[in-house]
A protein has these predicted regions:
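Donor nucleotide-sugar binding/catalytic pocket of nucleotide-sugar-dependent glycosyltransferases
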Residues: 54-57, 115-118, 125-160
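Conserved acidic donor-binding segment of nucleotide-sugar-dependent glycosyltransferases
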Residues: 287-296, 302-309
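Short alpha-helical donor nucleotide-sugar binding micro-motif in glycosyltransferases
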Residues: 234-235, 242-247
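A charged, aromatic-enriched C-terminal amphipathic alpha-helix characteristic of glycosyltransferases
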Residues: 307-338
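Glycosyltransferase donor-sugar binding loop
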Residues: 40-42, 197-215
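A conserved mid-protein helix/loop that constitutes part of the nucleotide-sugar donor-binding site
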Residues: 19-26, 178-192, 196, 211-212
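Nucleotide-activated donor-binding/catalytic signature segment of Leloir-type glycosyltransferases, i.e.
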Residues: 213-234
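Acidic donor-binding loop of glycosyltransferase active sites
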Residues: 245-258, 271
Length: 339
């Protein structure tokens, strides 16, 4: 009997930021006899019948850590014992799990794809059996433990869309209003190409992000882009496929070190994507890439896209995502590495 434990922040298919995790959990559940999910909170009925959920939410961090360790210790002492504990995006889970799991022979896997390095991440890397990421450029530390497994996109939820030839071309920038997303660069590029419109869609979850949103809104006014740029709040996870279908191309200037999942999601829908991050050089042709922080380079790529065969580009990108970055291939690799 194959059993796997996954630790994640939240199980909520409607969450605009963490909703994509649910597809990963479902794919893992389809490949094991029992999946145990340790989480702060979970939406009832979101996962299959062979999934057990243990919540460890608490009002204080120390108590939350104690509740997590108690829940994990019970799973490690039960039979059959899990083959591995997968810590999803939060290094602290790997750090807390390792002293309990590894002495019993249970592997600790850390999934992490972000540019931010920290002392906690270094510790988590040291105590984990294996580190998983999209590829070697989406994990900020050098380690021989790193295994590239793709991004894990639920392509079944993102059907290929044949988009009409619309004018003006509508670009989408999707995600949190973080300065790391390069939205200022995108606005300055759009200013240079009057044939396009831009939709910026996403939440502002921190004070810095709320301040940045205000700055972006002011910038739209200063650049006289009110008739071509819309900035709106997040859409629920179930509405994302419709959002992709309503636009013509995604533009992304996320800083190096994190392969933004929205790039792969948009590509899965047969939509052209223009992005700067070098992690996308195995997905995107050179003409769909630009220099990070360079609005002139981005404007040139947008102008090229205006004249390109966007349907053909989209079909090619879709095929690459299905082959290398689907949630099915991601789950296959996790289960294989869990042993």
């Amino acid at each position: 009997m194959k059993k796997l434990v996954v630790v994640t922040q939240q199980v909520d298919p409607a969450d605009a930021v963490l909703g994509a995790t649910v597809a990963k959990l479902r794919a893992l559940a389809a490949r094991v006899d029992e999946l145990v999910v340790l989480t702060d909170s979970a939406t009832a009925g979101a996962l299959p019948d062979n999934v057990r959920i243990r919540t460890f939410a608490a009002t204080h961090r120390a108590r939350r850590g104690m509740r997590f360790e108690t829940a994990l210790a019970r799973e490690l002492s039960s039979r059959p014992r899990p083959s591995a504990v997968l810590a999803h995006m939060c290094p602290i889970y790997a750090v807390l799990a390792a002293p309990l799991a590894r002495p019993t022979g249970v592997k600790v896997l850390l999934w992490f794809t972000h540019w931010r390095r920290s002392r906690l991440l270094r510790t988590a890397t040291r105590v984990s059996t294996t580190v998983l990421s999209v590829d070697e450029r989406t994990f900020p530390l050098q380690t021989s433990k790193l295994v590239a497994i793709g991004h894990g996109i639920d392509v079944s939820d993102l059907p290929c869309v044949k988009r009409p030839e619309r004018e003006p071309l509508t670009l989408l920038a999707l995600g949190r209003t973080s300065a790391a997303k390069g939205l200022v660069t995108i606005l300055r590029a759009v200013e240079q190409v009057p044939e396009v419109r831009l939709r910026i869609v996403g939440p502002s979850l921190t004070e810095d992000e709320r301040v940045h949103r205000i700055a972006l809104e002011r910038m739209v006014i200063d650049l006289a882009l009110l008739d071509r740029v819309d900035i709106t709040g997040p859409v629920p996870r179930h509405a994302v496929p419709s959002l992709y279908a309503d636009v013509d191309a995604l533009v992304n200037d996320m800083r190096e070190g994190a392969a933004d999942k929205v790039v792969y999601e948009a590509a899965a829908t047969c939509m052209p994507v223009i992005a700067s991050n070098h992690a996308f050089d195995t997905l995107l042709p050179e003409r769909l890439r630009f220099e990070h922080g360079d609005p002139d380079s981005l404007a040139e790529a947008i102008r090229w896209l205006l004249e390109a065969d966007r349907q053909a580009l989209g079909r090619t990108l879709h095929g690459t995502v299905v082959r290398d970055h689907s949630v099915e291939t991601w789950a296959d690799r996790v289960v294989e590495l869990a042993g």
